[in-house]
Amino acid sequence: HLLSRRQRQMCIRDSFITKRITRPLERLAQTANRISGGEYSLRTRIDSGDEIGSLSKSFDAMVAELEQQLENRTAFVADFSHELKTPMTSVIGYADILRTHVLDEHDKFMYADRIFKNAKRMENLSVKMLRMLKLSQTEPTLEPVESERIERGIRQMFENGENLDINSEKGIKILCDYNLLLTLLRNLIENALRFSDGQKVIVKIERSGNCCRFGVADSGRGMTQEEIRRAAEPFYKADKSRSAAGYGIGLSICKSICTLFKTELKFESELGRGTCVSFDLEVTE
């Protein structure tokens, strides 16, 4: 039974349409299988201009995001291991000296004190790491909080005579999670005090339109644009030669809390003049 000319044309057309649809889908499926096997750098790169092309672009964007997250996780683990290795090596070294040497009381105390301080460094690092992990699973409890209460909370956290000047506008009701906000402010203030070169750190709480603006300013060395861009990366330190303590985790915690509050950190800095970090929160009546 021979097909008519029209039927043959229809078969050819249908075959062309089928191949046009199935080939990109097969390519997409093959790429997905290879990616599931760990080849995260692969992309489908199907630019057909139709629904399949749109699906391909969304798929490639998703894989790119996944690849970036995996790279960030790998770098995070490597940085954490590096930061933990330094105090751990010190603890092992000083403990070995105490174990294998005959020392007088002064030297015993000196090495024991160094072990204690390095152990506290590791404890501090672990606490901040746990805090970051908890933040990724935290849902903020938003409630109206008066600016006076926030000011009191800051003063209670820094009641040991830190070089701190708090300028808070009265009567502002801020929609926030009070405990998370204090954690955010504590990390910003501690970071500013660390790099203020002994000068006063200024904290401002003031209304700005329909928002309340929180600002923490120091008069330290300032930051370059590259340092600002990377400031909230875990374990990033702008100047590794400085003796200031810290692991570069504080601003990462701040960024995570700002994300929960649906706001962002803003940096204004000038080299040799200092840095101001600010964020806005919604005001409620």
Question: What residue ranges belong to the model's regions?
Answer:
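Amphipathic coiled-coil signaling helices used for dimeric signal transmission
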Residues: 34, 47, 51-72
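Short helix-loop "hinge" at the ATP-lid/N-box region of the Bergerat-fold HATPase_c
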Residues: 192-193
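Short conserved segment of the HATPase_c
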Residues: 223-235
